Amino acid sequence: MGRRKKIVQECETLMNTPEQIRNIAIAAHVDHGKTTLTDNLLAGAGMISDDTAGEQLAMDTEEDEQERGITIDAANVSMTHEYEDTNHLINLIDTPGHVDFGGDVTRAMRAVDGALVVVDAVEGAMPQTETVLRQALREGVKPTLFINKVDRLISELQEGPEEMQKRLMSVIADVNELIRGMTEEMDDIDEDWTVSVEEGTVGFGSALYKWGVSMPSMQRTGMDFGDIMDLERSDKRQELHERTPLADVVLDMVCEHFPNPIDAQPRRIPRIWRGDDESEVAESMQFVDEDGEVVLMVTDIGVDPHAGEIAAGRVFSGTLEKGQELYVSGTAGKNRVQSVGIYMGGEREEVEEVPAGNIAAVTGLKDAIAGSTVSSVEMTPFESIDHISEPVITKSIEAKNMDDLPKLIETLRQVSKEDPTIQIEINEDTGEHLISGQGELHLEVQTQRIERNQGIPVNTGEPIVVYREAPQQPSREVEGISPNRHNRFYISVEPLEQDIVDAIKLGDASMDMPELERREALQEAGMEKETSQNVEHIHGTNVFIDDTKGIQHLNETMELLIEGLEEALNDGPLAAEPVQGSLIRLHDARLHEDAIHRGPAQVIPAMREAVHNSLIDAEIRLLEPIQNVRIDVPNAHMGAASGEIQGRRGRVDDMYQEGDLMVVEGVAPVDEMIGFSSDIRSATEGRASWNTENAGFQVMADNLQPDKIDEIRTRKGMKLELPETIDYF
């Protein structure tokens, strides 16, 4: 029997014993060595050759991942590991580290119970380290730490034992500071989740040279850091690997310190699902009941050239089998399961069934998207997966040949299904479509894949930055009148407090929640009690309050009012950009008693006009997206690096020394950061490494607003004259 087939059989057997299952993700800042580490784990499990581990990058299966040398998609693999005489099934997801692909990390965290955070010993904790930790902790996923590239401290930087210990302890302290800050507010975590060398939740080593150590492994092998430094310096890395193999150290840590599904699900389910906690479904999810109703949370959609769409996700309850007819949240009817399987590296292996507590690969769920709840009974869906950052860059995309247009439209729909952080706007009339993503690289990869994988030659436009509009002060009460003059609505707008905006963004307050729970969440974020009781609708980060009392026919008209409200908020009055962070109050209404005179053609424009005029009275402004920028550069080039930020309307917040490099930290508008890569390379003679991270939106300077508004209105084919009442720039 082939080695691979044997592993599949072992996995199938272990799937039925949740105590021996560990669902884990490996996450880190870009280039800190996740995929090389994953190769080592695969080699340790006998799934790839030990000789090629670290070079094969077995989890980077796409051509563009191999070319760019970075992980773009999260990849799944199941493997086995024997720990303390017991065989364990480890379902592992290798995630991207580049900020543009953070959506894949967020979705992966929903499927797992533990996150192995990898940090480069030389660079230390970086911006994306903080982001992946936040993504893990928000989903109730327990972290451990592996400090990689320790060989560089010994051989390259020639650090002595004291210097090295100081550096490693500093990395651990930084990571623990992040963990403490994020878990303080989490009531459902009653244990200390900080990492510790003594406890065995920290490992050290070199993924490239395949050796690793932890406190338990040093006690077991009798090796200490002195031995490691001697072997590393005398270039006896193979002996080091043989005496203390990396895979054993890391997988032992995974088995010992990460929870199994039986321990994890009772804590995680209330965090990610807001249904009735007394129901049978709740009970079978919390107890990982393989005989309960089937509940699958889809975290990823991929396409196989032979099998078609494959939905990957975590089975929280029941047992998935071929032929089952399952509900998909947000769609009518049922989908029939064509096959179930598990992942072995880049390939899917079909199995008879996948029980609760495992990660499965399913075909046949044609209506599912990343984030869908799939179940054998109709149920409250899981909380939507909140992505840390929203799209900030848009490009137009069109087929070079008109004959390819239908295929391109279909492909774009598929792209947004596979990656919910990509937003697609399809205009079937003009043939020009818009694709929005997290950054230039994100869009570049998606458009190249459309050309390469689908064979559709495309033209793309210049990158366009996504803006927002927001009120700056409370407005007066404004009247909106319907075209037939029989219906009147009295509206005011005010800025929504930032804490309430954050609560909505994080999913702590939404219209999907029971009303009482939503009220409490909004009050906790700072909303007044009476206001929270009158919340009628939440759209984006805008809240609509109905302050009216006993108005006849209002209930039956409310749906049209909300439609008009959403139209006004989707296209703000300045430049038809989305409005955010506003509280809209309906104070009073006058409605015609005859329904025929208060139909859509009357109510929607009246509401839209009232909201727009209120926003103008509230001195609405354009907001631009900004990015945090960090540049690591030799001292001689520090001035050039800070000049690159300042020359882009940016601001330098901090400069400090870290090792032999200077670190420059600041913020800059996304619009000005287009083309930054090539400019910083030439300014620093290729000596700089840098990171950017989306940091939300800020009000654009008043002197820049008119020109930017004109530019956007021109691009959208709108008339250039703003409403006369906009006279505050």
Swiss-Prot record:
GO terms for cellular component: cytosol; ribonucleoprotein complex. InterPro entries: EFG_II, EFG_III/V, EFG_V-like, EFTu-like_2, G_TR_CS, P-loop_NTPase, Ribosomal_Su5_D2-typ_SF, Ribsml_uS5_D2-typ_fold_subgr. The keyword Metal-binding does not apply. Residues 19-262 form the tr-type G domain. It is found in: Cytoplasm. GO terms for molecular function: GTP binding; GTPase activity; translation elongation factor activity. It holds the Pfam family EFG_III. GTP binds at residues 28-35, 94-98, 148-151. It comes from the Archaea. The modification Diphthamide is found at H597. Keywords: Cytoplasm, Elongation factor, GTP-binding, Nucleotide-binding, Protein biosynthesis. Catalyzes the GTP-dependent ribosomal translocation step during translation elongation. During this step, the ribosome changes from the pre-translocational (PRE) to the post-translocational (POST) state as the newly formed A-site-bound peptidyl-tRNA and P-site-bound deacylated tRNA move to the P and E sites, respectively. Catalyzes the coordinated movement of the two tRNA molecules, the mRNA and conformational changes in the ribosome. NCBIfam families: aEF-2 (TIGR00490), small_GTP (TIGR00231). Belongs to the TRAFAC class translation factor GTPase superfamily. Classic translation factor GTPase family. EF-G/EF-2 subfamily. This is Elongation factor 2. It comes from Halomicrobium mukohataei (strain ATCC 700874 / DSM 12286 / JCM 9738 / NCIMB 13541) (Haloarcula mukohataei). The lineage of its organism: Archaea, Methanobacteriati, Methanobacteriota, Stenosarchaea group, Halobacteria.
